[in-house]
Amino acid sequence: MNAHSKILAYNSSVKFTNWREKLQTNFTNFIIDVKDVDMFGDKVGFIKAVVDLKIDGKKIPGITFIRGDSVSILTEIRTESYSYFVLVYQPRIPVGDFIYENPAGMMDESGDPAGVSIQEIEEETGIKIKKENWKFLDSVYTSPGFTDEVVHLYHVILNMTEYEVLKLNNRLTGTENELISLKVVNKKDYLRLNKTAIGLSSLYLAKV
């Protein structure tokens, strides 16, 4: 894709227009300089921008990584005797390590976080869920000094047998270019393994 096509793509993307409209609502007299755009095929992935903005004559740091909204799903499994949580274990290059986290994914252009949540659960765990099984917890910023990302948090409750839980544990999943394995854990191990702010926030908000 050439530079002109990229400009047309990011200018019309939901993530960029939403971010720009929010800036226009809350600030005046700013200039947006888009430095680079990462494309995922023909779709806009990430946008790196610098905003020239002053408030009362003081220049405000404006380096921004625009990635749009995401979803994260606290996946709880209940058997007759125990309660478990499903974590995904995968390499995360920005932190230089493999980490445990909740099933999650980026929003698409549909702007439907509930629909994306269901899709991500199926892709990352192989579990099919119904809307009545989950509830919305909250929407939170992840790193507002760097990125526009808002994560919509959901809590899903599934009923399974101990045998079904056993089959789910250590399952290899994920789509192309993903290397994901599942870990089914109790609450104590969830707190020990999941060191993401999103994971800990979800557990707190779900009050489980």
Question: Language-model features: where?
Answer:
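N-terminal leader/linker segments that precede catalytic domains of diphosphate-processing enzymes
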Residues: 1-99, 106-119, 127-177, 183, ...
